[in-house]
Amino acid sequence: MDNKLEKMKELVEELNQYAYEYYVLDNPSISDKEYDLKYDELVILEKKTEVTLPYSPTQRVGDKILGEFSKYTHKGRLWSLDKAQNMEQLIEWHNRNLKVIEQYNSMSEDKLPELRYIVTKKFDGLTVNCTYDENGILIKSATRGTGIIGEDITAQIKTIKTVPLKIKNNHVIEVHGEAIMTKTAFEEYNKAAQVPLKNLRNGAAGALRNLDIKETARRNLSAFFYDVGYNEGPEFKSYREMMNFIKNMGLPQDKYIKECTNMEEVEKEIEYIESIRGELDYDIDGAVIVVDDIKTREILGYTIKFPKWAIAYKFEAKEITTKLLDVEWNVGRSGRVTPTALLEPVELGGVTVKRATLNNMDDIKRKNVKLGAKVLVRRSNDVIPEIMGVVEESLEESKEIQAPDRCPYCNSHLVQNGVHYYCENTLSCKPQMVKSIVHFASREAMNIAGFSEKTAEQLFEKLDIKSIADLYKIKKEELLTLEKFKDKKSQNLIDAIQNSKNCDLASFIYALGIPNVGKKTANDLVMKFKTLESIKNTTIEQLVEVPDVGEIVAKSIYDFFEDEKVISNIEELLNLGVKPYYEEERIDENPFMDKTIVVTGSLNNYSRGEIKDKLQSLGAKVSSSVSKNTDYVLVGEKPGSKYEKAIELGVKVINEEEFSNKIK
């Protein structure tokens, strides 16, 4: 037993170190296969011994759904920051600091040092507080809450792979950080989501406020740590020293930390941060400026709300107020009817905004949104703007928004399910059928070349195509009757439809349009169950064993294949000659296997999605940013700052022709 426990401890230490190298340093020292073998060995030992160490990597993703959030009292207060909207306000803050220091130094023999500031980015995420005990084990994580009392989100934080479950420290500490969702994670999540996320901040906040831990893990959050709020160990003399401690503990930390000795330098750094804002893989909404010397901080002190030794410089907001003119109800391929706000046109972030998201009637009521009212609109991450609230003074002459009782397209009665309304007329409701056909034919699904929404609309209206199976019954003579369909175009579409019959199983599963199932989940299902028959007959218990599949997604898949109409449609597709196949993926040795590659600029022979697929098929890892751990930067026409970064770091740069020659 003792030998097994020692082996477990050894494996846990090794796996945690490998995870740190992979997720934080972006510099793995072993292959994924080697990691998986060690991880599997640990799982077996934990089952045999019935012992699980609290910092074991197997504790990162639990299967449980929590009942509720419990309260947690922070050991050290989490302060808010005062804000400056312009340099004048920042200089006023600086001058106040100078005055206090000057007064102190004039009355004290123990002089304070020259004023020095540290400038960092201000992350637009959710503040978290992580507590490590005297053994260095992560024992609690909580939200900011009131700053004194937060909510326990320990299980949720453990899903963030960059957050260490154990650090090499023997004193109790609380470390403050920001949980964020990267743009890469946001895009990946939305590919599979039935309800796409609207912005990165809501993505992070919603994940940490989710009681279904597997659902939290699906968001693939990241974190940056920047402050020790409580410390029973040796005191820090400067913020620089504190940041070095955080880094040495293996906690993820942003690399941008700049030291400034005057306000001209501070202004220059703020301008730089704002200039790179759009290039970052995450959202920031400003810069944070703090006094470096800890003793000077103590002398400057606090107001009721803020520390006087720190301030946030806020960038121009992506929010504005305008009038809500009307609400338009639209039908998606699942039949869900969702509201869209029609706005009085207004300029926001260099774009004219006329429409905004209103998620559902519950959202409308919660925000008290009414027709004719002035509404606050936010545009984040270049996605569709969202209404965040109303200007209360504008509600007097406004009108209530009425929930629809009939489909705006086919006039069928709507059915309410939870907070959403659905049209169940799947056969003759045009938007549902058209969007289902377009999805089925899309590149990542059945890849029917030359298929468009305009084509789908004509097939529905003129050829009475009412199911995806009907696509395989279309004749060339019928296509010739459609607008802009001549002989060659008609034959090409017939050929493309016929060619799609031989498709890989993952593409077929994705094409079926299962709620909450994107291409990644479809791939994961196929890797787990291998055959269509196995997927059709799987249980919810088996489904939640698939990576990133939680209770909600599992139920969506299970319910989908329980529907007799779905099974009937699948059987009809198979009878019409559709043959989904599955092959175990084998990657031949090539120069890009296990290499980290960044792509910048426009390529002649690949779209951005195609080159990503190609590189992944070669066993490469595609990264969105250049670092010293990048192996290659593939450069096309009009490359961006990533090319300059590669030259600066001495990373190998190749063009498209060199890439093609290497894979011949």
UniProtKB/Swiss-Prot annotation:
Protein EC? 6.5.1.2
What are the protein's UniProt keywords? DNA damage, DNA repair, DNA replication, Ligase, Magnesium, Manganese, Metal-binding, NAD, Zinc
Its BP terms in the Gene Ontology are: DNA repair; DNA replication
InterPro entries per the record? BRCT_dom, BRCT_dom_sf, DisA/LigA_HHH, DNA_ligase, DNA_ligase_CS, DNAligase_adenylation, DNAligase_N, Hlx-hairpin-Hlx_DNA-bd_motif
Could you tell me what reaction this enzyme catalyses? NAD(+) + (deoxyribonucleotide)n-3'-hydroxyl + 5'-phospho-(deoxyribonucleotide)m = (deoxyribonucleotide)n+m + AMP + beta-nicotinamide D-nucleotide
Q: Which cofactor does it need?
A: Mg(2+); Mn(2+)
- SMART domains (UniProt xref): BRCT (SM00292), HhH1 (SM00278), LIGANc (SM00532)
> What Pfam families does the record tag this protein with?
BRCT, DNA_ligase_aden, DNA_ligase_OB, HHH_2, HHH_5
- Per UniProt, the enzyme's principal EC class comes to ligase
The similarity comment for this entry is: Belongs to the NAD-dependent DNA ligase family. LigA subfamily.
Role according to the record: DNA ligase that catalyzes the formation of phosphodiester linkages between 5'-phosphoryl and 3'-hydroxyl groups in double-stranded DNA using NAD as a coenzyme and as the energy source for the reaction. It is essential for DNA replication and repair of damaged DNA.
Quote the protein name from its UniProt record: DNA ligase
Q: Which organism is it from?
A: Clostridium botulinum (strain Hall / ATCC 3502 / NCTC 13319 / Type A)
